[in-house]
């Protein structure tokens, strides 16, 4: 497994600086996935929630876009990264999550003596207003966030095909949720149509919860043309078993009864307040 220093080896100094200053050391999925993605391999990242899967998939693409933007005479306004999510809400979250590193990276450019650049992200779903759809066709985003259904519709229109014709990277999120049903089959067909449209190899990156057998998920990700003797031509980053859990069971000091008194609830609320203040993120199931 590469060390954190090795994980940043091929990154631009600006993208490396933002990550180290803001997030510190890359997570294990990021350390394992980045070299494979930078080498151009199809990559499946299987890791639990909160392990940095999003930047594990996206950060190489962001770095590529930045380096292309800074190279004189080679920067073009074209959509090269396609993110597909089975949920519209998840797609909107991804756009907001990408805005933070993109804004931070571009803000660092003057410090490194580099000119300003713009890397745009747009969402295209059934809820996208017609005015925004037309704007995307005239001013293509560098990263397009969409759903399987909207991808299919884009592939059926002249403007949509033109927008997608420059795609070089596809990121499939929650890929395990689309296996084994008609929606997954439909998306698989759309990916093959997209591959034929571009006329060039498209790098496929999948994000999944830990699944077994993980090889079946990888087969779905790469498609039929990217398999050898039944084995997917894909790097599998399976970090699900590497996450450590610290579990603590606590009970109130007052006796527990079938109908808990307000005193007991008061102790629970007080403890929840303490835990919330001590931690950056807290999830409470009631």
Regions found by a protein language model. Name each.
Residues 54-64, 185-191:
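Motif I (Walker A/P-loop) of helicase-class P-loop NTPases
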């Amino acid at each position: 497994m590469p060390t954190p220093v090795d994980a940043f080896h091929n990154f631009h100094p600006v993208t490396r600086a933002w990550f180290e200053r803001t997030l510190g050391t890359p997570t294990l999925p990021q350390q394992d996935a980045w070299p494979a993605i930078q080498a151009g391999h199809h990559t499946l990242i299987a890791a639990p929630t909160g392990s940095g899967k999003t930047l594990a998939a996206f950060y190489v693409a962001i770095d590529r876009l930045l380096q292309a933007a800074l190279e004189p005479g080679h920067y073009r306004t074209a959509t090269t990264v396609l993110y597909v999510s089975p949920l519209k809400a998840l797609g909107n979250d991804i756009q907001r999550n990408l805005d933070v590193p993109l804004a931070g990276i571009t803000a660092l450019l003057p410090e490194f003596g580099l000119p300003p650049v713009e890397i745009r992200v747009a969402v295209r779903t059934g809820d996208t207003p017609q005015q925004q759809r037309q704007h995307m066709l005239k001013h293509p985003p560098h990263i397009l966030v969409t759903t399987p259904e909207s991808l299919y519709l884009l592939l059926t229109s002249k403007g949509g095909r033109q927008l997608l014709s420059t795609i070089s990277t596809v990121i499939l999120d929650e890929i395990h949720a689309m296996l084994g049903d008609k929606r997954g089959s439909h998306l698989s067909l759309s990916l093959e149509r997209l591959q034929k449209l571009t006329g060039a190899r498209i790098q496929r990156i999948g994000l999944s919860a830990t699944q077994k057998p993980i090889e079946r998920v990888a087969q779905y990700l790469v498609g039929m043309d990217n398999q050898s003797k039944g084995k997917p031509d894909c790097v599998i980053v399976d970090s699900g078993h590497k996450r450590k859990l610290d579990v603590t069971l606590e009970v109130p000091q007052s006796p527990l009864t079938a109908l808990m008194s307000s005193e007991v609830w008061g102790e629970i609320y007080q403890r929840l307040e303490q835990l919330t203040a001590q931690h950056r993120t807290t999830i409470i199931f009631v």
